[in-house]
């Protein structure tokens, strides 16, 4: 089973790489399965990738390759920080407030499940139609 999943993952990876490189039309003409040509194209990426500022591609001409991973990581962190600053005050609850809310929900749930003795009818939340059950 693991071998089959491994082969399927390799096939999927090859198809994704082929589509990303703009050779999706060639995939349709090939028979299914991993060929030697496909595996050799994966093992030699220097022939397939052009590390330039802009790669001319008929599908999306604005693809850029950057080798400065530090800059990319900084921009991702800046985006996350900006998103944190833009969050509404309701979403910025502290962990303590969230724990209190969870405790309140648990109390309400327990009260619904175990009503007091003076209640004659309780709603059974497990039933899909919320049919009242007599205690």
Swiss-Prot record:
It is found in: Secreted. GO terms for cellular component: extracellular region. Its main location: secreted. Residues 75-127 have a biased composition (Basic and acidic residues). Residues 1-24 form the signal peptide. The keyword Secreted applies. GO terms for molecular function: toxin activity. Keywords: Secreted, Signal, Toxin. Expressed by the venom gland. Residues 61-135 are annotated as: Disordered. Belongs to the scoloptoxin-22 family. This is U-scoloptoxin(22)-Er1a. It comes from Ethmostigmus rubripes (Giant centipede).
């Amino acid at each position: 089973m693991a071998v089959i999943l491994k082969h399927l993952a390799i096939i999927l990876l090859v198809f994704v790489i082929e589509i990303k490189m703009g050779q999706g039309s060639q995939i349709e003409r090939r028979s299914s399965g991993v060929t030697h040509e496909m595996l050799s194209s994966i093992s030699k990426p220097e022939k397939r990738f052009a590390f330039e500022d802009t790669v001319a591609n008929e599908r999306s001409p604005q693809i850029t390759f950057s080798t400065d991973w530090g800059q990319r990581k900084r921009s991702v962190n800046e985006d996350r920080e900006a998103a944190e600053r833009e969050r509404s005050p309701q979403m910025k609850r502290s962990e303590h407030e969230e724990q209190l809310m969870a405790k309140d929900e648990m109390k309400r749930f327990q009260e619904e499940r175990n009503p007091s003795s003076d209640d004659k009818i309780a709603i059974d939340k497990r039933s899909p139609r919320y049919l009242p059950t007599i205690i």
